[in-house]
């Protein structure tokens, strides 16, 4: 078997000899002019003669950076198949290969495969032709990284300062970097100038990939203190596509002088600057410079300044502020970079509101007499600002001002009186003080009038409940003129201090004449009331019923006695019958059961113990 190179040589010789056998024809070769793939993908380069000659040989040549050509492989058609030969892979891993369709296969494309590949077709008499296919390998860069300047940048600098450096690594082709401020693209040139510019540097890595770094320089202003910055890397993809990778956003630390100072009371206060005595009061001072300067707090004492505190936070707390701490306070911003025209000292006047405990001109329990007048109670309220005073009783205002006048005092006047003092300009600053008014006097009595059940008059035996209510001080005692079922009762009247007693009894004729009285008494006197019942009707209907009941009872008793007698006289027939008839028959001899003329118990029905009952007046007129 001949080696491949020998066979190829014979084929070339055959094609060369056949080229002289006839006229040379024109030959055309078809290859993809540009092949674009992502790094790591496979490339298959196809080369086809358009005229389809019967015998031909094609070769793949690699054009290096200097333009020199290097033979990589050759392909011979054998019927419907192709015989490929790799002549030189030039150290590539994995090496080139020819597939079953006669294509040059470049596996796992790398950036180094970006070359021109020339396909040369030799077809003997048909001629020789070639075509070039350019391979482009794209690689997406790594995530975009930004390194901001972590120092403090001064807005007073007259030149652009370094803002940040942005990096986009290992991409192909070389990516492009743009800068953004607050989401808007910055149009900065590459040339050095005082307002802003950027520089860039490209590095080709050992892998053949490219890394790009860009540094941004800007002249900063105070308005940039809250600005956000970021960068973005733009890269190309196959088929004219593009990609973008944004970095994270960042902010800068700027140094700028103070232009304005504010000083105010931070804790709850009124618009007039009042604060409550005893509260923790915060004084806040704020300058708009950066970084935060020192704040010096002081209090004016005549023509002198009393130094209170120096800090970087800009706040001063007065714990449990006292009325003596009212006065003028100041804050000084220690910023030596500030313009001379800037007012770095601010002052305010602190007003400490207070309200002393209220003082009443009467003790906590105060007594007056019923119907008295001219009593005055004074409520003394001292505070700043001047408090407003009013008197209330049962949450109802009874007097405006510190003076409470008690005139025409009644028992309803008794109760709890409260003096309320408040300062409308200072919320929650208020005080109260109360006293108990006691009204002394003879009892006041109120009866609960009653009406007959029938509506017009009382009937003897009706049950009635009488109620008397009284009030006074000391508490009165309620007594009744009649005995009965006495119980405490709920007062039926509205008002303060009432007490009640109820008496339950039956109506009689005697009550109608005398009446029933209740009396309330205490050390100051007594008061009474008599309940009258008017005429009391007798129980007529009930008397008739009683008489009838007695008559029926007597009749029943007589019948029982008669029945008993008849039972005793069963031995004498006709006796009871004669007794039932009106006239006695002619007398006949009487025989007892024992045969004697006189029965043993005859005396039971006779008028006397002698038994002489015949025609006598002491019995029922007959033995029967």
Swiss-Prot record:
Domain Ig-like C2-type: 268-343, 357-436, 443-534
Record-annotated membrane-spanning stretches: 544-564
Pfam family, one: Ig_3
Boundaries of every Ig-like V-type domain copy: 26-136, 141-251
Positions of modified residues (Phosphoserine): 592, 594, 596
Record topology, Extracellular segments: 26-543
GO annotation, biological process: angiogenesis; cell adhesion; cell-matrix adhesion
Secretion signal, residue range per the UniProt entry: 1-25
Subcellular location: Cell membrane
Glycosylation-annotated residues: 315, 371, 378
Record bears the keyword Repeat: yes
Top-level division of the source organism's lineage: Eukaryota
Region (Disordered): 477-497, 574-624
UniProt-recorded Gene Ontology molecular function terms: laminin binding; laminin receptor activity
Cytoplasmic side: 565-624
Biased composition (Basic and acidic residues): 587-601
Disulfide pairings: 47-119, 166-231, 285-331, 379-419, 468-518
GO CC annotation terms, alphabetical: cell surface; plasma membrane
Quaternary organization: Homodimer. Interacts with ITGA4:ITGB1. Interacts with spectrins SPTA1 and SPTB1.
Function description: Transmembrane glycoprotein that functions as both a receptor and an adhesion molecule playing a crucial role in cell adhesion, motility, migration and invasion. Extracellular domain enables binding to extracellular matrix proteins, such as laminin, integrin and other ligands while its intracellular domain interacts with cytoskeletal proteins like hemoglobin, facilitating cell signal transduction. Serves as a receptor for laminin alpha-5/LAMA5 to promote cell adhesion.
Name this polypeptide is given: Basal cell adhesion molecule
Source organism per UniProt: Rattus norvegicus
